[in-house]
A protein has these predicted regions:
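Short, surface-exposed basic-aromatic patches at helix termini and helix-loop junctions that form
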Residues: 18-21, 62-65, 148
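Hydrophobic helix-cap positions at the C-terminus of alpha-helices
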Residues: 18, 112-115, 150
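Short glycine/serine/threonine/alanine-rich loop segments
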Residues: 24, 68, 134
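Catalytic binding pocket for nucleotide-activated donors in carbohydrate/polymer assembly enzymes
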Residues: 34, 39-126, 130-131
Length: 152
């Protein structure tokens, strides 16, 4: 597991202790480095982004482009861009927890791990989410649709 970012000092200290105990299983990096973030997003199966406040968020979109499935708290831009995966309906692009509790976050992670065991379905979802388009062309069309509805 790779952890990038900073937050509550008490938690950082606990994570540092875990890293010392399990150096081959955990890497804790209490800073933010854009290049390293992209390396993580490109080289992992899942990307946990448990932000309590995220007005936009780009990392979840980068993760999708790299084929890494995001696990996010439903807030701000994360709520706008990530929808719960539904294998039967072939919809969604990540795993979402709606209450900011450790229990709900663990449930979302468990749903991701359940998908991880379904290799064929996971591959299909990865291919699908890598094609998602968050470009300004799409956003512009969505805004124009809204303005058109307002004016009519």
């Amino acid at each position: 597991m790779i952890i990038l970012g900073y937050g509550d000092k008490k938690i950082e200290n606990q994570l540092d202790a875990f890293q010392k105990k399990y150096p081959d299983k955990l890497s804790v990096n209490p800073t933010f480095d854009e290049t390293f973030a992209h390396m993580i997003e490109a080289g992992t199966d899942f990307f946990l982004m448990p932000s309590q406040f995220e007005p936009c968020g780009m990392n979840q979109m980068y993760s999708l482009r790299y084929g890494t499935i995001p696990i996010v708290y439903k807030v701000g831009g994360l709520a706008d861009t990530i929808q719960e995966i539904n294998i039967d309906e072939q919809s969604g692009n990540g795993f979402v927890f709606e209450k900011y509790t450790s229990r709900e976050m663990v449930r979302a992670i468990k749903r991701a791990l359940k998908l991880y065991k379904k290799t064929e379905e996971l591959h299909t979802i990865i291919v699908r989410v890598m094609k998602e388009d968050f470009s300004w062309d799409v956003s512009t069309d969505q805004y124009l649709d809204i303005y058109h509805k307002i004016l009519i």
